[in-house]
Every structure is written in structure tokens, then in C-alpha cells.
A protein has these predicted regions:
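Bacterial N-terminal signal peptides that target proteins for export
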Residues: 2-10
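Basic/polar N-terminal segments that are highly enriched at the extreme N-terminus
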Residues: 1-2, 23-27
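Bacterial N-terminal signal peptides
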Residues: 10-21
Length: 287
């Protein structure tokens, strides 16, 4: 991955999204040397116009098949651990818990979303991979479920009454032929972007020489036949255990990149929703 290094000052996205870094900088005069912003390359999307309900389904694990287990991460020496942020770095408090409580109170009784069948049971069983890293997300009309599978990361699409509409489908079957994302690794992420009424999916893909964050953004709220945009973002290290969220001006994802530490990526949400070339992703080092 070709990366350009920029100083944190003047990087408006960094200041908008990562207050922790900004606070550390303002109090200490300048950030640590590895707190610069790295900029990748623009990514041109590939349009995916297929009906997922008519695609071949992924083979599911059955008793007797091998089970692949992820190796536990170790630090060397074995009694060493990654240090916390230095004590003299002042960081912003975590207000999420308080805000969640205020949100729960403000909703009031009877404001829950209703559906004909409020409970949907997804009995997935063993997938041949440990851990499975299951994820689930809902929209007004659909439920998407993703999990690690022996043949690659898979997802299923249900309606709100629990009827399976499509899948299991492997993420890699949506990637263009020959692209590194045609090799599925693990760690599915699925979000419903409620601000745009679209789906956002991501998995860790690629090969040892071509690491990727493989991103799929739906063209409509219909994940079955509404179409998708594919974006393959190169990363300089294995982007293990990604987690993402939706911000009003970016899709923001974190990764654990081994000796490189925890990283934060900001992706061009506006262009990705429109199927346009995504401006270069920005990569930050976490506190």
C-alpha cells in the first residue's frame, strides 16, 4: 500500500473524528512521531448487479469436516503486554454509557420498533471455524447475519419474519475475479447505514502479499436484488479483527495490525454511497 504521511494539524477529518488524538496533541504541543495521518490511494468501485437469491449457496460445515481455529495472539516475551497510553496523555472521557442511558430514557415507553414476529431465531450451528465471530444487523425490512465459515466468510439475508431470502453467500463471490478480495479470510462486519438507508459490509480478505479490507455498499435498502458497490482497500499489514461504525461523513473502521498496533481507517462514505471513486482512505494510529 502506498501511503503518504501528513502532519495531524490541518487534517480536518482527524480532528472531527478522533478527539482523543487532538486533545493529546493540543496538550503536548505535538503528537508522537507515529501519530501522523497516512493516506492511501483512491479506489475505483466495481458494480455488482445480481440477484443473490439466485446465486449458488456456500457449502455449510457438517460433522466430520475439519475445524479451523484461529491462533491466540501472543506477545513476546510471553509475560509482556502492550502498554497503555502514557499517564501524562490526557484523553477525553468515554461518554457512550451516559449517552446510551439518556437515549433509552428519551425514547419513552411504547416507542420500540414493532414487527409481525419480534423474535427471529438463527440456528447457525457449527461453521467449521473457531471463533465464528457472528454479527447481525437489521433494517426496516431485512435481517443480515454474517459469520466465519470453513469456505470463507458468509452472510445470509432474512426478512423480518425469519424467512431466509438469500444465502449462505460467501463475501468473496461478490469480489471481481482476480482481485485479492476473491480470497476470503475472516471477520465479517455488517451495518445498516440508517442515514442513507443502505447496507455496509466488510471483511478481512486478500493474501499475505496483498492485504485487503473488502467493502460492499448496497445501492438500495434491498440487499437481495438491489445491487452493490465493491471497494477493495489495500492495507500495509494484516487488518485483523476489524470493527466499524457509520459517521455522517465517513465509514470508520479499526483494526489490530500486530506489531503496528491498533489502527483507525476513515473511508469516503459520500462517494461510496454514490458508486463513485472513493477518495484515498486515511489511516491513523490509535492512542
Amino acid at each position: 500500500m502506498k501511503l503518504k504521511h501528513l502532519h495531524l494539524v490541518g487534517a480536518s477529518l482527524a480532528l472531527a473524528l478522533f478527539g482523543t488524538v487532538a486533545i493529546a496533541q493540543s496538550l503536548n504541543g505535538k503528537p508522537p512521531s507515529d501519530f501522523g495521518v497516512e493516506v492511501g490511494e483512491p479506489v475505483t468501485p466495481v458494480s455488482i448487479d445480481i440477484d443473490l437469491s439466485k446465486q449458488p449457496t456456500a457449502a455449510e460445515w457438517k460433522p466430520g469436516d475439519p475445524i479451523r481455529e484461529a491462533a491466540k495472539r501472543q506477545y513476546y516475551p510471553l509475560d509482556a503486554v502492550k502498554p497503555h497510553a502514557p499517564a501524562d496523555w490526557v484523553t477525553s472521557p468515554d461518554l457512550l454509557g451516559d449517552r446510551q442511558q439518556l437515549w433509552d430514557i428519551s425514547r419513552g415507553a411504547g416507542s420500540e420498533l414493532k414487527s409481525p414476529n419480534a423474535r427471529i431465531n438463527i440456528d447457525n450451528g457449527n461453521t467449521g471455524v473457531s471463533p465464528g465471530d457472528p454479527v447481525i444487523e437489521v433494517s426496516q425490512n431485512y435481517v443480515l447475519y454474517g459469520v466465519n465459515n470453513s469456505g470463507g466468510t458468509i452472510f445470509k439475508i432474512y426478512n423480518k419474519t425469519g424467512t431466509l431470502l438469500a444465502g449462505p453467500t460467501t463475501f468473496k463471490t461478490l469480489a471481481p475475479a482476480g482481485d485479492p478480495c476473491a480470497t476470503s479470510v475472516s471477520d465479517p462486519i455488517i451495518h445498516f447505514d440508517r442515514l442513507a438507508n443502505r447496507w455496509f459490509m466488510l471483511e478481512m480478505g486478500g493474501t499475505s502479499s496483498a492485504n485487503r479490507l473488502c467493502v460492499y455498499v448496497s445501492k438500495t435498502e434491498n440487499p437481495v436484488s438491489g445491487g452493490w458497490w465493491f471497494y477493495g482497500f489495500a492495507t500495509p499489514a494484516v487488518p485483523d479483527y476489524p470493527h466499524c461504525t457509520v459517521w455522517h461523513n465517513a465509514y470508520v473502521c479499526t483494526t489490530n495490525e500486530s506489531s503496528a498496533g491498533a489502527k483507525v481507517y476513515a473511508f469516503d462514505r459520500a462517494n461510496m454511497l454514490n458508486g463513485a471513486t472513493a477518495r484515498a482512505a486515511q489511516r491513523f494510529t490509535s492512542v
